[in-house]
Amino acid sequence: MESHEKEAPRVARSRRAAAATGLDRVIHERVRLGILSALAVNDRLGFTELKGLLDATDGNLSVHARRLEEAGYITCEKGYEGRVPHTEYRITRDGRRALDRYLSHMEALIGAVKG
């Protein structure tokens, strides 16, 4: 069996586990959690800064940032610095609350597993 065939069931199990434990499925993904975490400790970050911090591709970061924006967890402002396009993100109050809930839930799960 090829490695990608083994990975699909693992991803499906992870999604089912997130749903079963009540974790916020919007946040429960590596890049989206990284975006929210970075924005929680920075007032604002540009697309290029986030891309570098998260080691993400342009397309990957765009898709995940859009998903967070649709959920109301971040805002996105597009503009220009001189003639260069610039995209800047900020976490919203709802995003900060959702991240806090998510982290509390994860801490409780970890505590339960550790006993």
Task: Please tell me what each predicted stretch does.
Residues 1-20, 34-37, 93-115:
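Amphipathic alpha-helical dimerization/coiled-coil segments
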Residues 18-60, 81-90:
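N-terminal helix-turn-helix DNA-binding core of bacterial DNA-binding proteins
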Residues 65-66:
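Short, hydrophobic-biased segments on the C-terminal half of alpha helices
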Residues 72:
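Glycine-centered, phosphate/nucleic-acid-interacting loop/turn motifs that mediate DNA/RNA or nucleotide
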Residues 76:
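Short beta-strand "wing" residues that participate in macromolecule-binding interfaces
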